[in-house]
């Protein structure tokens, strides 16, 4: 999904929606960036994840995935080829590096997320989370779109 917004001052903002992990969405983003030529790229990950992606690109290492990431990848693979780290993030980093532009992470950092999580999660939420994870592992999904 792509949508361009024209601001009153003449600035254009392009919103690109992709599925985290699908290789084809990374390829679509790469093509979109080449056409749109942004001066700044914002991605829906925290700044610390951008640093990790850059380090990974310089010296790839084995990644450890959570249970949810494994389940997500397994289900997502029904819709196309999947890759970790997600190609949509990798392409954003590659583009920003190549054109020496600013890459902004716009999600909460780990400390902020942890604080919000601790302030809002209750014991029953954690129990529901465990039950939901168990159900997802045994659920059969029938969607034709990711």
Regions found by a protein language model. Give the residues of each.
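A short acidic, amphipathic alpha-helical/loop segment
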Residues: 26-32, 92-95
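Short N-terminal binding/cap micro-motifs at the start of the first secondary-structure element
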Residues: 21-27, 52
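Proline-aspartate-enriched helix->loop->beta-strand connector
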Residues: 34-45
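Hydrophobic, often amphipathic alpha-helical segments used for membrane interaction and targeting
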Residues: 52-146
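N- or domain-start disorder-to-order transition segments that initiate the globular core
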Residues: 1-13
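PAPS-dependent sulfotransferase catalytic domain
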Residues: 47-49
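Short, flexible loop segments at the rims of nucleotide/cofactor-binding pockets, characterized by
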Residues: 16-22, 80-83
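Hydrophobic/aromatic beta-strand patches that form the interior of the parallel beta-sheet core
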Residues: 14, 42, 102-106
């Amino acid at each position: 999904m792509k949508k361009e917004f024209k601001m009153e001052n003449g600035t254009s903002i392009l919103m690109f929606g992709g599925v985290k992990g699908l290789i084809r969405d990374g390829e679509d983003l790469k093509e979109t960036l080449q056409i749109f030529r942004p001066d700044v790229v914002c991605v829906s990950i925290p700044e610390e994840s951008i640093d990790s992606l850059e380090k990974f690109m310089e010296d790839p290492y084995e990644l450890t995935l959570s249970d949810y990431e494994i389940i997500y990848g397994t289900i997502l693979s029904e819709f196309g080829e999947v890759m970790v780290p997600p190609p949509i993030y990798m392409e954003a980093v590659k583009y920003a590096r190549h054109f020496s532009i600013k890459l902004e992470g716009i999600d909460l950092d780990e400390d902020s997320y942890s604080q919000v999580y601790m302030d809002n999660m209750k014991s029953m939420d954690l129990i529901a989370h465990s039950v939901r994870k168990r159900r997802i592992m045994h659920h059969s999904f029938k969607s034709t779109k990711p």
